[in-house]
Amino acid sequence: MKRTIIYICFVSLVTIICCIFNDEIVTLYYDAIRYFSNNDTTLEKNEYFREVDYMYVQNTSNYKPKNSKDIRNLFYTIINSGDDKFTFYCPRDYDNCLNDVKAIATNQTELSHINNFVHPFNGFKHIEIQYTSSGQVDVSIVRSYNDEEIEEISNKVEELYSRLVNPNMSVIDNIKVIHDHIINNSKYDTARSDYNMTTYKSDIAYGALIQGRAVCGGYSDAMALFLEKLGVKNFKISSDSHVWNAIYVDGVWYHLDLTWDDPVTSNNTDVLQHDYFMLSTSELHSKELEEHKFDETIYLEFKIQ
């Protein structure tokens, strides 16, 4: 409390001085803002925070970035935390900080890739990043799922998990059971993919698990929720036009694509396949390359195979 009062008094005093004196005082003022703000910064983490580091992004407690990688990790940690608003400040000795912030903030593809590494419930629908010439960076996030959707989906996952998962079966066999259930109880939402009709929330797990309609985002989010409960390390992986699951089992990363295992047929009959179940990258690309061509500089776990 004492420190907060001192800080408020200091800022008020320096604000008055800045109105009277020169740019050097203004610089001193902003340096003080950075010092107090960065030292008082805390990031609240919700229950869906992933205590997991990946090769492309890692959690960080460093809110004073020194390079572009620090900034990327900070954005990952902010999104991963589930916090809706967060502010950090560029250090004065990091000359290119704002340019590096802008490079990520204006690159929706990069932000979407970062989003693939967080728990579905912490993923964003929209992210706004604002910055000032003084080095203040404000991040505001609208999540993909609201509280009501999370509660309904979580209840459904709990119900299905207790019914479908057998502790006496292997992890892979349990993943296959869940894979089959999601496909057998969902249809691919062609109205959304072909005509942009949004009758269903098929781009998120709500469509797949509650409404029985899904596109690739819905299939992959639904699968990710069960993988979390199984304790299987995972993330989503995306190309320019598609998204699917990456899973880590017995020391190996695999591709898992429920969308392509639930093909659309000309007579609208339901088909369950396992053609895209637990594949290596070479196996995946031997089957289909155009929609599964991904950036190996981002999804580095597959580059080392």
Task: Give short role names for the model-derived ranges.
Residues 1-16:
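N-terminal Sec-pathway targeting helices
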Residues 22-138:
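Intrinsically disordered, low-complexity N-terminal segments that are enriched in acidic
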Residues 63-64, 207-210:
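Acidic, metal-dependent phosphodiester-chemistry machinery of nucleic-acid enzymes
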Residues 140-147, 249, 259:
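Secondary-structure transition/turn motif
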Residues 146-208:
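Secondary-structure boundary elements
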Residues 217-284:
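Hydrophobic/aromatic-rich core segments of domains that either
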Residues 269-305:
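Low-complexity, Gly/Ser/Thr/Pro-rich intrinsically disordered linker/tail segments
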